[in-house]
C-alpha cells in the first residue's frame, strides 16, 4: 500500500536535497566581466613592467617554493614588450590531459597544479628593434578559486 508513495517521496527528497546543495554551491564559471578584468590586469601590468601586479595573479597556496620562484621569473620575462594579443581560451582535451598530469619539479619531487584549470591565457608578444620585429607566444593555465581567476603554481602532488 505504501510502496508507491515511499518511492515517490524518496524521489522528491532527492530532488530537494540536490536543489538545496546546488543553491549553496559557488559558481564554477567566471563571468565575462571577470575574464576581461583578469586579461586587462595582466596586459596592463605586463606592458607597464609591474612585477608586483603580475605576481599577485599567481595562486600560491601550497605552492612548491622552487616552482613559485620559477613562475615569478616566467611572468616577468619580456615585461615592457607590446602585447600583440592576449585572450583567455577554452581548454582542449589535450590541455586538460596535460594539466591533470603530475610533473617532476627541479628537485625531482612530483608536482601538480594547485588549482584545476578552467581556461588558458594565450599571450602573443611583439618585440621591435631597429633591425627586426619578432613575436613570441606563451600559454599559461588559469584556474578559479573563491570567485577569482588565478594562475595556479604547482604544489607537491598528493
Task: Describe each PLM feature range.
Residues 24-52, 56, 60:
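Short, low-complexity N-terminal intrinsically disordered segments enriched in polar/charged residues
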Residues 7, 29, 125-127:
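A detector of low-complexity, intrinsically disordered, Ser/Thr/Gly/Pro/Ala-rich segments
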Residues 4-6, 39, 68:
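General helical secondary-structure elements
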Residues 14-23:
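Bacterial N-terminal signal peptides
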Residues 93-158:
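Exposed beta-sheet edge and beta->alpha loop/turn motif
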Amino acid at each position: 500500500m505504501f510502496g508507491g508513495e515511499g518511492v515517490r517521496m524518496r524521489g522528491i527528497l532527492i530532488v530537494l536535497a540536490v536543489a538545496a546543495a546546488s543553491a549553496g554551491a559557488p559558481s564554477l564559471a567566471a563571468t565575462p566581466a571577470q575574464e576581461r578584468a583578469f586579461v586587462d590586469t595582466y596586459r596592463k601590468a605586463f606592458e607597464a613592467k609591474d612585477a608586483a601586479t603580475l605576481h599577485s595573479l599567481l595562486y600560491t597556496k601550497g605552492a612548491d617554493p622552487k616552482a613559485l620562484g620559477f613562475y615569478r621569473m616566467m611572468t616577468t620575462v619580456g615585461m615592457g614588450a607590446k602585447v600583440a594579443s592576449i585572450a583567455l581560451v577554452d581548454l582542449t582535451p589535450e590541455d586538460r590531459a596535460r594539466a591533470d598530469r603530475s610533473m617532476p619539479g627541479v628537485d625531482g619531487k612530483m608536482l601538480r597544479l594547485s588549482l584545476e584549470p578552467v581556461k588558458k591565457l594565450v599571450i602573443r608578444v611583439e618585440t621591435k628593434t631597429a633591425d627586426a620585429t619578432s613575436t613570441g607566444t606563451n600559454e599559461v593555465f588559469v584556474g578559479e578559486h573563491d570567485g577569482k581567476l588565478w594562475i595556479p603554481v604547482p604544489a607537491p602532488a598528493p
